[in-house]
């Protein structure tokens, strides 16, 4: 049998609920998607639970699951993925955190968890921190900028553990939290103490930084602290090619996703202008996927803009991003034709009126370039997906893709 190449397209936070501004439609229902609709003639669709029904998935656990790795077995926390995706090279026993540049007042009350989100000076602030901190109590500290307000912080040294709590209160008008040990070990107490000293040091440096003084003079919020969460010790993960036999690559601008893909052995490409936001280079990402599909068996294409709009409650932004998603699919079909297996879904549901992840299932579409018993539906959205034949978990995705690309191996005699 002919083996087909695979495109797996995830629009982050794609799933939604009825939106008042859209007359009770979801953004995916509201948008006309001619290119995706063209695929329906040879597609099966349905609903996917990224982890299992009702479980509110993070982007980290959902992607592990969709890549065929059970998060209950392999997930240790998000920090290490963020750090790798932001450029860190980790070794065993390193502890990494994800973080936000944020704004606090002089009483450590959070004014804005993202310091306005778009921080043009983020690279310079990270450079200043790396130059002025270096280590605390013998523990080496390194800072890495991801995208927008996102930062990764890596601790290296003896006696560290990821069994410590976050400093991020996850809400505005709340005080920055003290990190606390999550067990009774001396390593947990030591690491929590390091984090608390580090947080105060970060504030001292950033609050007096000339960069932030200029931001304030322009009417912008100072990025004067880093809120830390998701502590994770670095552990090796199985390599994607070893358990799928697929030579794989990914297109993403988001540090978390880049980190996961890199850690399981995928080549990761971030095209010029790809930002992880609504202003990303949509067609540049599609073109990058096209080029990679000439060389690789499996290409993962990630779009963060849908989730960014959802978290901001930006209905028009999510509609715009879904329109661009359809253009991306059209661009790929124009350049490569339809001789591909194509899966399109979201990694979780982020309703734009809720502004947070929920445990709702996400619509899932699987197109194949040959005759199958297709699902008879009119569109690709949450409501039509309920009429399709699929009800799967994230862990089922790779097996489906291997089967329909004619690459699956027989289980048993």
From Swiss-Prot:
Name of a matching Pfam family: PhosphMutase
SUPFAM superfamilies xref list: Alkaline phosphatase-like (SSF53649)
A molecular-function term among this protein's GO annotations: metal ion binding
Functional note: Catalyzes the interconversion of 2-phosphoglycerate and 3-phosphoglycerate.
This protein's pathway: Carbohydrate degradation; glycolysis; pyruvate from D-glyceraldehyde 3-phosphate: step 3/5
NCBIfam families membership: apgM, PRK04024.1
Gene: apgM
InterPro entries for the chain: Alkaline_phosphatase_core_sf, ApgAM_prokaryotes, Metalloenzyme, Pglycerate_mutase_ApgM, Pglycerate_mutase_ApgM_sf
Entry's EC annotation: 5.4.2.12
Species lineage: Archaea, Thermoproteota, Thermoprotei, Sulfolobales, Sulfolobaceae
Gene Ontology biological-process entries: glycolytic process
Keyword annotations from UniProtKB, A to Z: Glycolysis, Isomerase
Name of this chain's protein: 2,3-bisphosphoglycerate-independent phosphoglycerate mutase
UniProt source species: Sulfurisphaera tokodaii (strain DSM 16993 / JCM 10545 / NBRC 100140 / 7)
Catalytic activity: (2R)-2-phosphoglycerate = (2R)-3-phosphoglycerate
Family indicated by similarity: Belongs to the BPG-independent phosphoglycerate mutase family. A-PGAM subfamily.
Keyword Isomerase: yes
